[in-house]
A protein has these predicted regions:
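Short beta-strand/loop motif that positions the catalytic acidic residue
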Residues: 204, 210-212
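Catalytic histidine-centered segment of alpha/beta-hydrolase-like enzymes
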Residues: 242-251
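Conserved alpha/beta-hydrolase catalytic His-Asp/Glu region
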Residues: 113-115, 137-200
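Conserved HGGG/HGGXW glycine-rich cap/lid loop of the alpha/beta-hydrolase fold
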Residues: 5-54
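Active-site loop/oxyanion-hole signature of alpha/beta-hydrolase fold enzymes
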Residues: 46-81
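Flexible "cap/lid" loop of the alpha/beta hydrolase fold
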Residues: 93, 102-134
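Gly/Ala-rich beta-loop-alpha elbow adjacent to hydrolase catalytic centers
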Residues: 80, 84, 88
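Conserved alpha/beta-hydrolase "acid-adjacent" motif
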Residues: 217-222
């Protein structure tokens, strides 16, 4: 329990090793399990469900910092994917005393067309949120599974099969509807977040890695902006085959 809020989390791995803190998108914490199984042989890891009490990005991240304190974790290595990559950047900016290094994969930064497009939906988003709340959970999960087919179109057959199984498993839990709506709200709140500056991450110079898939769901221009921001900080920028889902659900 942190600030009176019950937290569901998994904390395991190699005792005494550096701790990896995972940030994910769409409230799909399950995506990190293949990574935890592999990295847990050398590192400690922490995966947690984002709390429902706030959709404000800074408050969400400060809550994560309080969770670390409650677990007596002083330093972490950040790994963020999809929208979770933006959360990792916010954590690195707000809590530099807690960060050893940062890895970002198949993600972007606040200075992106993705976020600018969200700003254009100021009037339509509240209506969409209302509809999401009214639609029965089973129907909403079927729609999510149908939409996931588009995410998987550019993946290899092996990754498509893995991705389908992953989405089906997540959607089989009808309680995921509330997590999905919460995630939708949190992403919408990023629309007004201030742009990051190079100085925000100067302390991590040479300790940042950015992994970019060849066929990401995010625009190449957004990938380039992310690479430009961290390339100035001597980050290792790596490009690889595959798409958004393949990078996330497979731990390679």
């Amino acid at each position: 329990v942190v600030d009176g809020v019950a937290v569901r989390y998994q904390y395991g791995g190699q005792a005494g090793a550096p701790v990896i803190l995972f940030f994910n998108g769409l409230e799909m914490q399950e995506m990190w399990m293949p990574y935890a199984e592999k990295l847990g042989k050398k590192y400690r890891f922490l995966i947690y469900e984002y709390p429902f009490h706030t959709t404000n990005a800074d408050e969400q991240i400060d809550f994560a910092a309080k969770l670390l304190k409650a677990l007596s974790i002083e330093k972490v290595i950040l790994i963020g994917a999809s929208d979770g990559g933006v959360y990792a950047q916010i954590f690195a900016k707000r809590h530099p005393e807690s960060v050893l290094a940062m890895l970002l994969t198949t993600t972007l930064t606040v200075d992106s067309d993705y976020v600018r497009d969200i700003r254009k939906e100021r009037f339509s988003t509240p209506i969409l949120l209302l509809l999401l709340k009214l639609v029965p959970a089973k129907t909403e999960m079927k729609l999510l599974l149908k939409k996931s087919t588009g995410f998987l179109a550019c993946e290899s057959e092996a990754d498509r099969e893995y991705g389908r199984g992953f989405y089906e498993t997540v959607a089989s839990d009808l309680h995921y509807k509330q997590r999905f709506i919460q995630s939708f709200k949190c992403v919408y709140m990023l629309k007004d977040y201030p742009l990051f500056k190079e100085s925000d991450f100067e302390y991590l110079r040479g300790k940042i890695q950015v992994l970019l898939p060849e066929k990401d769901i995010f625009k190449k221009e957004d990938q380039d902006r992310l690479a430009d921001l961290f390339g100035k900080l001597d980050a290792e920028i790596l490009h690889g085959p595959g798409g958004h889902v393949g990078f996330i659900v497979q731990s390679a």
